């Protein structure tokens, strides 16, 4: 089985062996999501893991024959439905990402900034585009590959 996958990753606050003794202002938060496409069957899917309770209603969005969207970090849940609507209109994932970002009103630039948003868009053919804002966290990133083996693993590289 070959698969296309993109894994956006977010962690609130930097983490390293040297920081273990430091006490963060709140417990560390991390969310990992993955979108996948199987070219043999045309199936798409996604999964999310998070320390944040009950993220399922705000991270993954999908529609058969259209695609999937994963939103995390400083989330605007409207990105999911917007992304699916634009994909259904025939826009490429790259144009979807650009269009959504350009239309974001950035209502609270100090605390809830568009620069903290992170999301991925995948169409029904496995084409993908991602965005990781410069203020999403000290350790955040994405990784994608056109094909992966079942046992292959990959980890995003911290910026």
Question: What does each of the following model-derived ranges do?
Answer:
Residues 11-19:
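Boundary at the C-terminal end of the N-terminal hydrophobic targeting segment
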Residues 18-131, 135-159:
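Alpha/propeptide regions of enzymes that mature by internal proteolysis
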Residues 1-12:
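Bacterial N-terminal signal peptides
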């Amino acid at each position: 089985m070959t698969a296309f996958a993109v894994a956006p990753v977010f962690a609130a606050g930097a983490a390293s062996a040297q920081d273990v003794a430091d006490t963060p202002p709140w417990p560390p938060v991390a969310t990992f999501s993955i979108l996948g496409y199987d070219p043999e069957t045309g199936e798409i899917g996604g999964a999310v893991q998070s320390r944040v309770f009950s993220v399922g209603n705000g991270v993954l969005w999908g529609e058969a024959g259209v695609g999937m969207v994963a939103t995390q970090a400083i989330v605007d849940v409207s990105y999911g439905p917007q992304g699916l609507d634009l994909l259904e209109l025939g826009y490429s994932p790259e144009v979807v990402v650009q269009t959504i970002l350009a239309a974001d009103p950035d209502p609270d630039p100090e605390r809830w900034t568009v620069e903290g948003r992170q999301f991925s868009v995948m169409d029904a053919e496995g084409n993908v585009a991602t965005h990781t804002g410069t203020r999403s966290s000290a350790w955040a990133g994405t990784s994608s590959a056109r094909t992966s083996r079942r046992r292959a693993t990959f980890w995003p590289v911290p910026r």
